[in-house]
Amino acid sequence: MNREEQLGVLESLLFAAGDAGLSTEQLTEVMEITHIEALNLLELLSDRYNGSADRGLILLELAGTFQLATKKAHAEFLRKLVEVPSNTVLSQASLETLAIIAYRQPVTRMEVDEVRGVQTDGPIRTLVAKGLVTDKGRVDGAGRAKLYVTTSEFLDAFGLNSLEDLPKLADPATDEPDQNEMDLFFDRFNQSKEQEEE
């Protein structure tokens, strides 16, 4: 693999890792390169992002991990995007992600990914932007991934007084909600949204 291909792989890995970021150890293992090669690739990618006004991303190093982030210069536009009222309902992926977080909180994105079997960075960003989920600290250890929990807005949106009002599972630590429980969960959300519109 040549240098340009390595940069493409690196960028893909950083994107897929989301806000959990990647350590140089993870990069060396996944890309099968040396520590020095990983640092050189990270520096080259960072220079490309920083050296070009037409790029919307930067490479950050936080708590020993590297992650992609948006440029501060674009903050005004990102804020507008979040503030624009959205009449769209949550996607199935977002609803499933929300149910997993509700039942297993506090939970990391990687744990949610494992339950759903697919990457959930997008749905989690949507849920955070809509105020249904927030991060509440980080796990100890390598990577220091964010822990996600539901908010009081989540309780309001689903007409719940507390998390104890969620449909019961046999064992929330191991069981996933069955389809009937998920339907009840989503029906409560849709009913509360219809009441808001009246």
Swiss-Prot record:
Cellular component GO terms, alphabetical: cytoplasm
Coiled coil feature spans: none
Protein name (database record): Segregation and condensation protein B
Entry annotated with the keyword Cytoplasm: yes
Subunit structure, interactors included: Homodimer. Homodimerization may be required to stabilize the binding of ScpA to the Smc head domains. Component of a cohesin-like complex composed of ScpA, ScpB and the Smc homodimer, in which ScpA and ScpB bind to the head domain of Smc. The presence of the three proteins is required for the association of the complex with DNA.
The keyword Cell division belongs to this UniProt entry's keyword annotation: yes
GO process terms (BP): cell division; chromosome separation; DNA replication
Cellular compartments annotated: Cytoplasm
Residues annotated as signal peptide: none
Function in brief: Participates in chromosomal partition during cell division. May act via the formation of a condensin-like complex containing Smc and ScpA that pull DNA away from mid-cell into both cell halves.
Annotated source species: Listeria monocytogenes serotype 4b (strain CLIP80459)
Intrachain S-S bonds: none
Gene3D superfamilies associated with the record: Winged helix-like DNA-binding domain superfamily/Winged helix DNA-binding domain
Family, per entry: Belongs to the ScpB family.
Region (Disordered): 168-198
